[in-house]
Amino acid sequence: MFFVISGLVIVNSAAAATAMSFLKGRILRLYPAVWICASLTLIVIATQDVNRRIIKNYLRSITLYPGGPWIDGQYWTLACEICFYALVFIMCAMGQKARMPALALGLSLASTVFIALLYALPDSDILAIFTETAWRAIPFYYGCQFAIGIYIWLLSQARMSRISWVGLICALVTGAAQIYMAGENTSERTLAAAGHSFSPLPAVAIWVAGLISIVASVTYAKQISRLPTALLQSVKTLGSMTYPLYLLHFAIGVQLLDWLTDLEMTPLLALALAVPIVCVMSLAVCKWGEPPIRSVLRLVFDRLGQRVAGLQAKESRV
């Protein structure tokens, strides 16, 4: 679902942007929260252990180095995001923004072929490179999810052709198969580790429900915009919290659970306290941490732009 939303939002952002303004917007969106959250994670980890490996992981995280390993496991998804951003940036730089349907189709077909091969050859070491290593950032495995997001945007713009509908159907079928296969894999590992398994169908149902909610929010955007301002602002804040919450929830959340259970709290009570603590931290990051950093970065970009413009003006006079 994360990548579906990204496909929708990123293509929508690129539609009215130049290549450089798109790049600037992505830097302003990604880096401030990463700098804060990775630093907070490092502080928490340092209470238990700190060594050269952890520092290297931290540096890879704050630079969003796509190869990993990072300070916390979930940063791998940002590597996938950056690869997708690179594709969109290249299209903007080449003046090919009107060909976003072709990008969606390419992602959809590539992902369909890859998932089909993965189903037919589940033990392939070559395919595992693109699912289990840093190379998974290349959008073979997750390309269908990005494609669905792009197709939702195309639907909102009434730009769906017959071939786009074929691409959307491929992406939906492949996406459902991917979720089901991932659920089966998780179930098998749970069976081996804990002695019980579960059906992957609920995961597929949740994914479908998420897609329906995204399509509904785009379809009824005008009606939603007429809701009370206070409600819309609250929803916007909750949306802004999701990014830092995603970056903070695992390492810091687990450490909080350890600390709280060490105080002889029951696991359920520890969880009930850890969740709001991490949510409050996420709110603090998005409301008071990210904005000042973005302001400084904007100032830096503006000054760089002025210098470049000045140099270009001097060269034109020579």
Question: Language-model segments: which ranges?
Answer:
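Membrane-interface helix-loop-helix regions
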Residues: M1, I5, I10-S13, A19, ...
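Alpha-helical transmembrane segments in multi-pass integral membrane proteins
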Residues: N12-S21, L87-R99, L127-K287, P291-Q306
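Flexible domain-boundary/linker segments
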Residues: K24, L40, V44, A79, ...
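Short, surface-exposed, polar/charged, turn-prone segments marking secondary-structure boundaries
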Residues: Y31-P32, V50-N51, M91-A93, G106, ...
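Small-polar-interrupted transmembrane alpha-helices in polytopic inner-membrane proteins
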Residues: A102-A120, L168-T174, V278
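Charged, low-complexity, helix-prone segments enriched in Lys/Glu/Asp/Gln
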Residues: V113-I115, L304, V318
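Short, charged juxtamembrane terminal tails flanking transmembrane helices
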Residues: G310-V318
